[in-house]
A protein has these predicted regions:
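Aromatic-lined substrate-binding rim segments of carbohydrate-active enzymes
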Residues: 70-106, 146-173
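Aromatic- and acid-rich polysaccharide-binding/catalytic face
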Residues: 70, 133-146, 188-221, 274-280
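Bacterial N-terminal signal peptides
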Residues: 7-20
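Aromatic-lined carbohydrate-recognition surfaces of secreted/lumenal glycan-active proteins
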Residues: 40-46, 100-112, 155-190, 237-250
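Short, acidic/polar
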Residues: 45-62, 112-129, 184-196, 252-264
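Active-site groove signature of glycoside hydrolases
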Residues: 66-76, 122-152, 273
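Boundary/entry segment of secreted carbohydrate-active catalytic domains
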Residues: 26-66, 71, 107, 247-248
């Protein structure tokens, strides 16, 4: 009888915890405006940019950029933060020019512990002057883990852990291009849009058209469809979006015009950029002027 009574007590406690958890209010969202305005991207392969961080920051500022997305590592990197000293100098130099810096990490979902550690490293990172990133982002695009169900669970768990640890630091998801997944759904069936939307503060889809879609109309239609799909898949017509086009040096004048027109006509995006800084030519910067805020 004592055993039964003890089991009932444990069951009651478990139920009360579950009910409390279910009824607990959702964590307040952080300020997504960090991801707003004209942006650009830097990845871990841009060694030349890190060789002279101050000059890089000066050139970025001259283009009127408001937010720089900087990759700290990916799941195959040898360390949790690549080039930390040079990265710190870049962050300090960008901040000195009034430019926000968002760190992003590309998880592979194969080694979940490593992905967790490297994601949290974005939050703990400090420059030599004590400065931190203004926001963090997870690039949920890797398909290295072939088990789709496990991949999705780990992606959502990783985002949830990072969101919990981030507090007031905003979190963005850099997802698969929604139009690309519509065209090739086997890439990531049942991508966890709604779960990630419930956790994050914004999305930054990389809506690449360069090389595959030629001309104004094809580019315009693709980008417009991608933005509509993102809102539909997340179930939130007001989801905060920073849209990234690209790859920058594969977009000709007509494609650039189509991308800019699609973003302008949409009228609901938070920010805009081309991937990436190293491949964005002067003509592309001029083309972005109408949507640079």
């Amino acid at each position: 009888m004592a055993t039964v009574r003890g089991a009932l007590v444990l069951l009651a406690v478990g139920l009360s915890v579950a009910v409390a958890s279910a009824s607990a209010p959702a964590a307040p969202r952080a300020d997504a405006s960090v991801f707003g305005g004209l942006g650009t991207w830097v990845d871990i392969y841009d060694g030349a940019l890190f060789a002279a961080p101050e000059q890089t920051a000066s050139r970025i500022a001259a283009r009127g950029v408001k937010v720089v997305w900087v990759e700290t590592a990916n799941d195959r990197s040898a360390v949790d933060v690549v080039r930390p000293a040079e990265l710190g100098r870049l962050v300090d130099s960008l901040h000195a020019r009034g430019i926000r810096v968002v760190a992003w990490y590309l998880p592979g979902h194969v080694n979940h512990g490593r992905d967790i550690r490297r994601s949290l490293a974005m939050l703990s990172f400090r420059t030599t002057t004590g400065q931190a990133f203004d926001g963090v982002a997870l690039n949920i695009e890797s398909t290295r883990l072939r088990n789709v169900a496990v991949r999705s669970r780990r992606a959502v768990d990783l985002a949830r852990r990072l969101r919990t640890a981030a507090g007031e630091t905003p979190l963005a998801i850099v997802p698969f291009n929604p139009r690309g997944l519509e065209r090739r759904p086997s890439t990531w069936p049942r991508f966890p849009w709604a779960d990630l939307a419930a956790i994050s503060d914004a999305f930054a889809p990389m809506v690449y058209t360069g090389g595959a879609f030629k001309g104004f109309d094809a580019t315009y239609g693709y980008v417009t469809r991608a933005l509509r799909l993102l809102r539909a898949q997340t179930g939130n017509p007001d989801v905060q979006i920073h849209v990234a086009g690209g790859v920058a040096d594969r977009l000709g004048p007509e494609e650039l015009a189509g991308f800019v027109a699609a973003v302008s006509d949409d009228g609901g995006v938070l920010g805009v950029s081309l991937y990436d800084w190293a491949t964005t030519r002067p003509a592309a910067w001029r083309a972005l002027k109408p949507v640079s805020g």
